[in-house]
């Protein structure tokens, strides 16, 4: 069984653990650098990206997670997507810069503007998982404003990319872990 880490300093890491189990993987809740040696891939969960950055620095994990991402698969959702982006606006903030995208934080509005939407994935996603719409939970979600060459869009919502991949990296601006559909997590497992 594949072991996948979920950064567990803040955010919805428990929901990702359950989604990984549904997809057939063993979650490892990463709180210490030594745990990075036990896993094949890492999920950066949703939560609050500035708080996660502070905790990564406080726990002295920022450089270790950045190093992990240089050679291993990483999947970021919502705040995790922000942490993976090369560029961050509204306001600008530090990130790992793993994926050639620029994101705008909280672009869908305030907490009260959060929503659940049906998203039709592109054939490239469906051909590698299963057909059908994705239930996308957007909670103060970022918008991907710019993508560079080499980034593949797997699903969009209202014309904006919401699920992308670049090589071993997967990014969702929504929360696939908050639904019973394990296809996005299964796609990440295929990268391990």
Swiss-Prot record:
<feature type="active site" description="Charge relay system">
    <location>
        <position position="175"/>
    </location>
</feature>
<keyword id="KW-0378">Hydrolase</keyword>
<dbReference type="GO" id="GO:0006543">
    <property type="term" value="P:glutamine catabolic process"/>
</dbReference>
<dbReference type="GO" id="GO:0036381">
    <property type="term" value="F:pyridoxal 5'-phosphate synthase (glutamine hydrolysing) activity"/>
</dbReference>
<dbReference type="GO" id="GO:0004359">
    <property type="term" value="F:glutaminase activity"/>
</dbReference>
<keyword id="KW-0315">Glutamine amidotransferase</keyword>
<protein>
    <recommendedName>
        <fullName>Pyridoxal 5'-phosphate synthase subunit PdxT</fullName>
        <ecNumber>4.3.3.6</ecNumber>
        <ecNumber>3.5.1.2</ecNumber>
    </recommendedName>
</protein>
<keyword id="KW-0456">Lyase</keyword>
<dbReference type="InterPro" id="IPR002161">
    <property type="entry name" value="PdxT/SNO"/>
</dbReference>
<dbReference type="GO" id="GO:0042823">
    <property type="term" value="P:pyridoxal phosphate biosynthetic process"/>
</dbReference>
<comment type="function">
    <text>Catalyzes the hydrolysis of glutamine to glutamate and ammonia as part of the biosynthesis of pyridoxal 5'-phosphate. The resulting ammonia molecule is channeled to the active site of PdxS.</text>
</comment>
<comment type="pathway">
    <text>Cofactor biosynthesis; pyridoxal 5'-phosphate biosynthesis.</text>
</comment>
<dbReference type="GO" id="GO:1903600">
    <property type="term" value="C:glutaminase complex"/>
</dbReference>
<dbReference type="GO" id="GO:0005829">
    <property type="term" value="C:cytosol"/>
</dbReference>
<keyword id="KW-0663">Pyridoxal phosphate</keyword>
<dbReference type="GO" id="GO:0008614">
    <property type="term" value="P:pyridoxine metabolic process"/>
</dbReference>
<feature type="binding site">
    <location>
        <begin position="47"/>
        <end position="49"/>
    </location>
    <ligand>
        <name>L-glutamine</name>
    </ligand>
</feature>
<feature type="active site" description="Charge relay system">
    <location>
        <position position="177"/>
    </location>
</feature>
<feature type="binding site">
    <location>
        <position position="105"/>
    </location>
    <ligand>
        <name>L-glutamine</name>
    </ligand>
</feature>
<dbReference type="InterPro" id="IPR021196">
    <property type="entry name" value="PdxT/SNO_CS"/>
</dbReference>
<feature type="binding site">
    <location>
        <begin position="139"/>
        <end position="140"/>
    </location>
    <ligand>
        <name>L-glutamine</name>
    </ligand>
</feature>
<feature type="active site" description="Nucleophile">
    <location>
        <position position="78"/>
    </location>
</feature>
<comment type="subunit">
    <text>In the presence of PdxS, forms a dodecamer of heterodimers. Only shows activity in the heterodimer.</text>
</comment>
<dbReference type="InterPro" id="IPR029062">
    <property type="entry name" value="Class_I_gatase-like"/>
</dbReference>
<dbReference type="Pfam" id="PF01174">
    <property type="entry name" value="SNO"/>
</dbReference>
<comment type="similarity">
    <text>Belongs to the glutaminase PdxT/SNO family.</text>
</comment>
